[in-house]
């Protein structure tokens, strides 16, 4: 549509307006999906409308298209246990008001391995445990039947050493369209303020132009499938893409699988599998990463409630 063409044009213009965001990246964890439902499809979730609890860290413009009125979940992720050995806690909720307005809130806390702190003589005087925190809020409006727009805004911070932490404001802006079973979206993710180090060097966030497409269908009454495809072009010059699918039986049992090509982006390549069960609104989701690199053995679990 002409509206989507204008959005893509604006996104292209933003790439020219923010050359300072290229190069080394700050707060790379802001580019990661950590909730179990999204990790089950290798992070492909921009047009996902069934599990919307994590929309504050993804695409809030999808919320007004959801058949769910309210969705909340809390999760725990063993992030890259074969490499960085971090643990992440995430909490999210989204509310779909009359399929017109969408509101989302999200919180993420990352706990990284402790390291020894030494004094000038080299003697160990204690330990420090680095941490990451992100808080997001989003709002979306579906102004015509087939089209919505939405924006998330939040603050992310990393504490790297005692007395040394840095943070940045960041936003995601998306438009999404849905035509029968097909869904498409385009926008900018993680656009925000630069981070300045103690030396005065500036580092940009992992900002990307993001597009997504999806197809969902129900068949033989009790079966449904949701196929998702996302792609990101990072202002640093890297490209990434993810494809995933979810099969659901009677809106009670789901199985998921996906693959992400990471290239030189902030997140490496990996494959994933996942599963979920739902009963009386209570849902449990699991995801496991299959990879030979840093994502090997990453495991996510979440417990939520939706209606």
List each model region and its residues.
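Cleavable N-terminal export/targeting peptides
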Residues: 1-36
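Subset of outer-membrane beta-barrel
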Residues: 25-307
């Amino acid at each position: 549509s002409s509206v989507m063409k204008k959005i893509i044009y604006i996104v292209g213009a933003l790439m020219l307006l923010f050359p300072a965001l290229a190069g080394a990246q700050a707060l790379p964890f802001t580019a990661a999906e950590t909730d179990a439902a999204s990790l089950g499809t290798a992070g492909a979730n921009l047009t996902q409308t069934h599990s919307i609890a994590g929309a504050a860290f993804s695409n809030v413009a999808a919320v007004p298209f959801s058949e769910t009125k309210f969705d909340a979940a809390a999760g725990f992720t063993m992030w890259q246990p074969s490499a960085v050995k971090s643990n992440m806690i995430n909490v999210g909720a989204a509310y779909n008001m009359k399929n017109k307005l969408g509101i989302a809130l999200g919180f993420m806390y990352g706990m990284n391995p402790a390291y020894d702190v030494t004094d000038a003589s080299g003697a160990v005087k204690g330990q420090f445990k680095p941490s990451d925190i992100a808080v997001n809020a989003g709002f979306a409006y579906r102004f015509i039947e087939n089209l919505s727009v939405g924006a998330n805004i939040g603050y992310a911070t990393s504490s790297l050493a005692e007395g040394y932490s840095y943070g940045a404001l960041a936003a995601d802006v998306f438009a999404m369209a849905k035509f029968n079973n097909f869904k498409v979206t385009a926008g900018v993710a993680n656009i925000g303020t630069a981070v300045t180090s103690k030396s005065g060097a500036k580092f940009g966030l992992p900002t990307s132009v993001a597009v997504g497409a999806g197809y969902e269908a129900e068949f033989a009454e009790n079966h449904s499938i949701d196929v998702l495809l996302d792609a990101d072009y990072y202002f640093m010059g890297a490209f990434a893409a993810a494809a995933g699918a979810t099969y659901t039986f009677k809106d009670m049992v789901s199985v998921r699988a996906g693959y992400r090509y990471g290239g030189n982006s902030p997140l490496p390549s990996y494959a994933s599998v996942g599963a979920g069960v739902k009963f009386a609104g209570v849902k449990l989701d699991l995801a496991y990463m299959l990879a030979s690199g840093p994502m090997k053995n990453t495991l996510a679990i979440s417990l939520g409630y939706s209606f």
